[in-house]
Amino acid sequence: MLKVGITGGIGVGKTYISNLLEKMGYPVFYSDIIAKEIVSKDSRLISLIKQEFGDDIYLADNKIDNKLLSSIVFNDNNRLSKLNSLIHPFVFECFNEWCEKQSSRIVFKEAAILFESNSHLNLEKVICITASKNSRIQRIIKRDGRSL
């Protein structure tokens, strides 16, 4: 099975390309979506995150408190790296299990931080999507319903 990564910065069109590939019949693993799911569903990961960031990082319904987490990690690269080091092994595990269930000769893995997480080491090829800064800004504004 050929494993191909899809990566690039925010607003470059990773999801657009991934959706096209899916429409063509190729399986696509969406790393960011899986990461968001498992931080609220995998009890092993929840325990590790609570150990590192405290019980208050989770709300009553086992949903992560994104505002609190953001205030901690996005002002401290060491804490962000620690969070990523906790989450990425679980995403790798999910990807490997997902691959075992695929019958396609080619699968794709979309990940915004493919290289930073060392995910590329488990892939045969990587496609890096790019776009101009202006295009990216316009896409993000449209996608998020924001204005400048």
Where are these regions (language model features)?
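ATP-binding Walker
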Residues: V12
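Short, high-confidence coil segments that cap the C-terminus of an alpha-helix
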Residues: M1, S103-S104
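P-loop (Walker A) phosphate-binding loop of NTP-binding proteins
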Residues: G9, L21
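Hydrophobic anchor at the beta1->P-loop junction of P-loop NTPases
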Residues: V4-I6
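Walker A/P-loop
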Residues: T15
